[in-house]
């Protein structure tokens, strides 16, 4: 059926389109990715297997000036509170108010150090102009102080909406009294009715069970990912985001955490397991109560752009997400032995569809070796992956501590010498209009034309997951006559920009080169 559209009809369609576009709130990704006129770069300053020596905050403190020199503008710190044990990475969250201050779980310090050491590290970062993002774990609590008798039913782990037993009493680890902290910072004590379920019955001690609590208002939170029927339950004691006391306490904690450390933003854990509207409203509340337009990025771990878009819509686009689909594209490319179609490297990604809401990353603590979501990008492809995230215009990139400093416990080498030149390219040269040349199965590239705010800026990135080669790319007529070299050192020689602003840039096989006017 052919539709006729006159001027009025066209204007109506245009107005409707503009209303849709303007209904998406401004996101801070654009601000953070272009930090005070320079390119912003986040570093995730931890990996899963850091030593339990209590010195990580001290390491961060002493590293602040070095991070600044590399162009790092924000640091995502690990969960800073007391976990279920001293060696807990922080995701077995026990007491969100204990930042290494009280004798609980057999220790005063956390895996990373004491509260005073943490605050000194934050001060050092701030003095170097680096923002601090706190990790936020609100989905569950671990390391309870005591058990309680709770009425519950078992559910099918593969379909949590299906009850597989009748109701009976279990012994659940759900009582949190915080005896070492008492009422300092907060007098709130957690009880069974603040949770939705657990995966352990202390009285029966059976593995591979998930128990959904019974009682007034008890049900899985409904506004979550639909994997396994309802993916509210993940681990430990699952927090009930429908309970008004819980909502109020977590909001109060968010304000306290922000003000105590002077945080500039958050990384929010496991949001696909948390009621979507809770996360949306929590962010809005903390921003309003602190008077700070806090940056926020959520971890929605699913290689499914549609599911991520649904989450962003349900949360009113008020924060960004990690680009998990891009991570898997990078991982798959690294495993394909040169047979990945590099023209499609951005297909199905957040940064392609919603660049203003995309935090791009290569790997993190969940994808590293021996973790539940292991999907570690192979070493040979890491420089290509970091060039893909660090030298392009779109997205707000994050650098993983385990890539930069290595993972000694698993024999993963530090790639600092490979990543530093790419960070330098981002800091000094990756500015201005972008021209894409994603037109070959193996060899792809793009250029940045530079801008007047950054003298000598502009670059040409070219990479191949197969054989080496070259590509003519446009860098700007104002670059005519300039002699460019490869900042990575992978290629020797130079490229002279012709009178029309084009250069013939080359790359080795299975490698990346970033050409700049040094």
Swiss-Prot record:
Active site (catalytic residues): 269 (nucleophile), 299 (proton donor)
Give the pathway.
Answer: Glycan degradation; starch degradation
Query: Do the record's keywords include S-adenosyl-L-methionine?
Result: no
Point out the signal peptide segment. Answer: 1-33
Q: Which CDD domains does the record match to this protein?
A: AmyAc_bac_fung_AmyA (cd11318)
Name one process (GO BP) from the record.
starch catabolic process
Q: What class of enzyme is it?
A: hydrolase
Q: Which cofactor(s) are needed, names only?
A: Ca(2+); Na(+)
Specify the superkingdom: Bacteria
Q: Where is this site: Transition state stabilizer?
A: 366
> Per the record, GO CC terms?
extracellular region
User: What keywords is this UniProt entry annotated with?
Assistant: Carbohydrate metabolism, Glycosidase, Hydrolase, Metal-binding, Secreted, Signal
Q: Where does Ca(2+) 2 bind?
A: 196, 219, 221, 240, 242
Q: Where in the cell is it found?
A: Secreted
> GO molecular function: any one?
glucan 1,4-alpha-maltohexaosidase activity
| E.C. designation(s) | 3.2.1.98
Note on cofactor: Binds 2 calcium ions per subunit.
Question: Can you say what this protein is called?
Answer: Glucan 1,4-alpha-maltohexaosidase
């Amino acid at each position: 059926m052919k539709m006729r559209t006159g001027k009025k009809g066209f204007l109506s369609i245009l107005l409707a389109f503009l209303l849709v576009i303007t209904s998406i709130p401004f996101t801070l990704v654009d601000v953070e990715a272009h930090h005070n006129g320079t390119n912003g770069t986040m570093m995730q300053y931890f990996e899963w297997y850091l030593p339990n020596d209590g010195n990580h905050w001290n390491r961060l403190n002493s590293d602040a000036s070095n991070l600044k020199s590399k162009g790092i503008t924000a640091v995502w710190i690990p969960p800073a509170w007391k976990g279920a044990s001293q060696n807990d990475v922080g995701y077995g969250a026990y007491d969100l108010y204990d930042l290494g201050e009280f004798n609980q779980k057999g220790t005063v310090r956390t895996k990373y150090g004491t509260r005073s050491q943490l605050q000194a590290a934050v001060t050092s970062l701030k003095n170097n102009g680096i923002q601090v993002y706190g990790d936020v774990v609100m989905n569950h609590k671990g390391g309870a102080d005591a058990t309680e008798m709770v009425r519950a039913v078992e559910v099918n782990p593969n379909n949590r909406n299906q009850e597989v037993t009748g109701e009976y009493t279990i012994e659940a680890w759900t009582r949190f009294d915080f005896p070492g902290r008492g009422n300092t910072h907060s007098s709130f004590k957690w009880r069974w009715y603040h949770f939705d379920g657990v995966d352990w019955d202390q009285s029966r001690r059976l593995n591979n069970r998930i128990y959904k609590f019974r009682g007034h208002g008890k049900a899985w939170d409904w506004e979550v990912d639909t994997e396994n029927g309802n993916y509210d339950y993940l681990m430990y004691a699952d927090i009930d985001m429908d309970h008004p006391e819980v909502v109020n306490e977590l909001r109060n904690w968010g304000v306290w955490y922000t003000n105590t450390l002077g945080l500039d933003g958050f990384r929010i854990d496991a949001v696909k397991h948390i009621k979507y509207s809770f996360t949306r409203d929590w962010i809005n509340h903390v921003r309003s109560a602190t008077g700070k337009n806090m940056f926020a990025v959520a971890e929605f771990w699913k290689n499914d752009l549609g599911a991520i878009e649904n989450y962003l819509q349900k949360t009113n686009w008020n924060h960004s997400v990690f680009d998990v689909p891009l991570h898997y594209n990078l991982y798959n490319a690294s495993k394909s032995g040169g047979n990945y179609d590099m023209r499609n490297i951005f297909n199905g990604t957040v940064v392609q569809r919603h660049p203003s809401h995309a935090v791009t990353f290569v790997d993190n603590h969940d994808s590293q070796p021996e973790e539940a979501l292991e999907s570690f990008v192979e070493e040979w492809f890491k420089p290509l992956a970091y060039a893909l995230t660090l030298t392009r215009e779109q997205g707000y990139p994050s650098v993983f501590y385990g890539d930069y400093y290595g993972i000694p416990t698993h024999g993963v080498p530090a790639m600092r010498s490979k990543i530093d030149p790419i960070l330098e390219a981002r800091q000094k040269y990756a500015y201005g209009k972008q021209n894409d040349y994603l037109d070959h199965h193996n060899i792809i590239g793009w250029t940045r034309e530079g801008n007047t705010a950054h003298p000598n800026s502009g670059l040409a990135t070219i990479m191949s997951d197969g054989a080496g080669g070259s590509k003519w790319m446009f860098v700007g007529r104002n670059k005519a006559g300039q002699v460019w070299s490869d900042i990575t050192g992978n290629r020797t020689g130079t490229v002279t920009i012709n009178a029309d602003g084009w250069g013939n840039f080359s790359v080795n096989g299975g490698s990346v080169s970033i050409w700049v006017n040094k």
